[in-house]
Amino acid sequence: FHQLISSQLDVDRMDYLNRDSFFTGVREGFIGADRILKMLDVVDNELVVEQKGIYSIENFLTARRLMYWQVYLHKTCICAETMLIQIIRRAKELIKSGEEVFVTPAFGIFLKESISLYDFKSNPKYIEAFTQMDDTDVWGCIKVWATHPDKLLSNISQMLLNRKLFK
């Protein structure tokens, strides 16, 4: 059953493909997740696909490939992600230098502390904070940072909010 939540064919991947397909309007990403799940079985503690489900699995793999090319690796998406990384880095720098920067509690842990992958995996505090975080934490902070006195932080935040992306 571990393979249902952590594999190349896990329910999270099926969910985000359908969700991302819906919200971006890219129909090629839509998959029949219900049908795929009905076609799965467990044999000798391994997840297997019934013969009649092979076509649905092929569609899933094709949909993932198409979504990568049309959405995830699209120049606009990559640019917005780069800007988001710069915003977070700048906020982290300001916090580290003692500057007052608004941040939600869950997001703040990751901006105020230097956390290695080992720390993240071994300390339940970080996993708990991560699971408490969602898009609202990030976007809420960016909206507040858009009026921050630091021009770099505020300008890039405003640009991302207004979808004026780097060229």
Regions found by a protein language model. Give the residues of each.
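Histidine-centered, transition-metal-coordinating active-site segments
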Residues: 1-167
